[in-house]
From Swiss-Prot:
Residue spans, topological domain Cytoplasmic: 1-85, 129-161
Organism encoding this protein: Mus musculus (Mouse)
Top-rank taxon: Eukaryota
Name this polypeptide is given: Signal peptidase complex subunit 1
Residue ranges, annotated region (Disordered): 1-22
Stretches assigned to the Lumenal side: 107
Family label: Belongs to the SPCS1 family.
Gene Ontology CC annotation, any one: signal peptidase complex
Residue ranges of coiled coil: none
Function comment: Component of the signal peptidase complex (SPC) which catalyzes the cleavage of N-terminal signal sequences from nascent proteins as they are translocated into the lumen of the endoplasmic reticulum. Dispensable for SPC enzymatic activity.
GO molecular function per UniProt: ribosome binding
Entry keyword set: Endoplasmic reticulum, Membrane, Transmembrane, Transmembrane helix
Transmembrane spans: 86-106, 108-128
Post-translational modification: May be phosphorylated.
Gene name tied to this protein: Spcs1
Length: 161
């Protein structure tokens, strides 16, 4: 049951905060509609070109799927080392500056700035992290597995008694 006009429009049956149903009379045969102030309508008209930048969600999805997302193992290692190094450097600089200035807030700000900077450098898959692509094995044919399961030796472990 909707309480307190949760449906967004003053319709005939609404409920109060106590949960009791109240009947609201419609005014002179007008349909039940939501009131929108003129400022809201003006704002919606101004924002329409920004919302319609991509004609459909499929076009937007195609654009996003064309961005590279993979990162090789050496790139991941480099990103992790850079991330830790930047945070450690910002923590040391922040601690020293905060100690000299006797302001703990500056220490926190400097460490937060270092964290944001390291995230900007390491989270996106920049080309520096994709220099060593993986070499995949070729696809094997299914015809090589003609052996019966009975031909295989069963490996048994020694008992630990």
């Amino acid at each position: 049951m909707a309480r307190g006009g949760a449906r967004g429009c003053p319709c005939p049956s609404e409920t109060s905060a106590s949960g009791a149903t109240a009947e609201v009379k419609r005014s002179a045969g007008r349909p039940c509609s939501r009131y929108r102030p003129p400022q809201t309508l003006l704002l919606n008209n101004r924002l329409r070109p920004f919302r319609c930048r991509y004609r459909s969600s499929a076009t937007m999805l195609e654009h996003l799927s064309s961005l590279p997302t993979q990162m090789d193992y050496k790139g991941q290692k480099l990103a992790e080392q850079m991330f830790q190094g930047i945070i450690l450097f910002s923590a040391i600089v922040g601690f020293i500056y905060g100690y000299v200035a006797e302001q703990f807030g500056w220490t926190v700000y400097i460490v937060m700035a270092g964290f944001a900077f390291s995230c900007l450098l390491t989270l996106p898959p920049w080309p520096i992290y994709r220099r060593h692509p993986l070499k995949w094995l070729p696809v094997q044919d299914l015809g090589t597995e003609d052996k019966k399961s009975g031909d295989r030796k069963i490996k048994r472990h020694a008992k630990n008694n």
